[in-house]
From Swiss-Prot:
Lineage: Bacteria, Pseudomonadati, Pseudomonadota, Alphaproteobacteria, Hyphomicrobiales
Reactions the enzyme catalyzes: (R)-4'-phosphopantetheine + ATP + H(+) = 3'-dephospho-CoA + diphosphate
Enzyme Commission designation: 2.7.7.3
Annotated residues for binding of ATP: 9-10, 17, 93-95, 103, 128-134
GO annotation terms (biological process): coenzyme A biosynthetic process
Protein name: Phosphopantetheine adenylyltransferase
Localization terms from the record: Cytoplasm
Family named by the database record: Belongs to the bacterial CoaD family.
Cited PANTHER family: PHOSPHOPANTETHEINE ADENYLYLTRANSFERASE
Keywords in alphabetical order: ATP-binding, Coenzyme A biosynthesis, Cytoplasm, Magnesium, Nucleotide-binding, Nucleotidyltransferase, Transferase
Pfam families in alphabetical order: CTP_transf_like
Pathway: Cofactor biosynthesis; coenzyme A biosynthesis; CoA from (R)-pantothenate: step 4/5
Enzyme class: transferase
Source species: Brucella abortus (strain 2308)
Amino acid sequence: MTIAIYAGSFDPVTNGHIDVLKGALRLADQVIVAIGMHPGKKPLFSFDERVALIEASAKAVLHKDAARVSVIAFDGLVIDAARKHGAQLMVRGLRDGTDLDYEMQMAGMNGTMAPELQTVFLPADPAVRTITATLVRQIASMGGDIKPFVPVAVAAALNTKFKS
């Protein structure tokens, strides 16, 4: 069985993240969505909220394939989380050349530290290429319409978060 790990902060999960997740499910039998926990960052959504949003979004968009997705938290190196959960592939989404430059450096370092773990780059669909969680949060905080950029459950959660 092929297991892939897809790491990020997912604060919040966007249609771009879901696009990468769909691609990962074409490559692997099981995909672990690994939410990085960074002590220096204060996320908008708690870990539990992000898990719930990822799971709800996966069910709504991926239907039966959502059963092949699990969500975990990790701190430290993603390669350690990958090893712990038996992943052979590390999936990374690419929006543009800037992402590629950074991700190539990370893949090189990860490849040196964990040669058994193969990094796979998935280019974002042009329809979601410009979406970032940071921009989504900014638009939502100013009352803008974020529905084109995030799954339905996430749009509702963002609207609730910024109305309170």
